C-alpha cells in the first residue's frame, strides 16, 4: 500500500485512518483506544501497556500539507492532562522544520508518510507466513537444473 492509496481509502472518513493506525499498534502488542471523533482532547489514540498509559498518538491524514508546530504543541498539551510520557504524531505527509525542531525539544516521536508505510509493511508482513523478502532470495540457473531430468537436459543442450 502506498501513501496515495491510504489517502484515497480514508479521505472520505479520516476517523477510519485513526483505526488503521491503532491497528498497527495493536499488532505490536499495545491496547489501542481510539478517542471519539469530536472533543478528543488533543489526541486520537491512547496506547496502553499493562493497563497503564504508554503513549498518546495524534493522526493526520494530509495529502501535501505539512504538519506544523501548532499541531505538535496541541499533542504536548494533551500529555499534561493525560499524564503521558510518550507522544507519537503520525501523518501521511511530512513535518515542517519548525514542527521537527519542536518535536525534538519535547521528545515527540514523528512518523511521516514514508515511515508509516515502512512500519505498516513490517507489521502486516510479519503476519503473513507466506511472505518473504524478494531481495534475500536469489536463484540462478543451477538451482533449476538439478530438477530437470538428465535426458531432457541433454536434448536442450544439444539444440543450443
Language model feature labels by segment:
Residues 1-41, 46-160:
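Mixed-charge (Asp/Glu-Lys/Arg
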